[in-house]
Amino acid sequence: MSRSISKLRETKETKVEIFLDIDNKGEIEVSTPVNFFNHMLYTLLYYMNSTAKVNVVDRQNYDDHHVVEDTAITLGQAFKEVLGDKKGIRRFANTIIPMDDALVLVAVDISGRGVSNVEFKLKRNTIGDLAIENIYHFFSSFSYHSGVNLHVIQLRGKNTHHVLEASFKGLGMSLYEASRILFEEVRSLKGSL
């Protein structure tokens, strides 16, 4: 049985449509009005080994904030819902991703507690058409709405693109590993997540 979901979020600011299948690696389509964000989302979904379609319409064209935030909310909710009761999932995973000069640690716990800690040492305020502050916002919003405890820590790196791409690769790989069904029971001393 494949774990897949379609999710729609509509506000006066954006319309976000997401299809996500976390058990079958297939075609990935990403379309938002923020080009660098498209690159990061595609990277995340690719390294999750997923099949996915993300389509975002910006109804107000203020800036990149609402696009990033609403996408993170919707993707987080979709990931949480597709996991169901989380029975048998590995739950924990971490990766250390090198990308040229960059080295980034990403760790996740699918605990139901969406707390994030993101530590970058970046010198730029923007990359392409995306504000760096909205990368932080993506991770915190995704973490909160998915119920995934998330840590992203830049260990090394001077190139902003490399650091961010390594972060999204690491998140994708960690989410894939943590969501694999390996056990019969819920992996919690409490008996539920």
Swiss-Prot record:
The keyword Lyase applies. Belongs to the imidazoleglycerol-phosphate dehydratase family. It comes from Sulfolobus acidocaldarius (strain ATCC 33909 / DSM 639 / JCM 8929 / NBRC 15157 / NCIMB 11770). It catalyses: D-erythro-1-(imidazol-4-yl)glycerol 3-phosphate = 3-(imidazol-4-yl)-2-oxopropyl phosphate + H2O. This is Imidazoleglycerol-phosphate dehydratase. GO terms for biological process: L-histidine biosynthetic process. GO terms for molecular function: imidazoleglycerol-phosphate dehydratase activity. It is found in: Cytoplasm. InterPro entries: IGPD_sf, ImidazoleglycerolP_deHydtase, ImidazoleglycerP_deHydtase_CS, Ribosomal_Su5_D2-typ_SF. One of its GO terms (cellular component) is cytoplasm. Pfam families: IGPD. Keywords: Amino-acid biosynthesis, Cytoplasm, Histidine biosynthesis, Lyase. The keyword Ribonucleoprotein does not apply. Its main location: cytoplasm. Its EC number is 4.2.1.19. Pathway: Amino-acid biosynthesis; L-histidine biosynthesis; L-histidine from 5-phospho-alpha-D-ribose 1-diphosphate: step 6/9. It is an enzyme of class 4 (lyase).
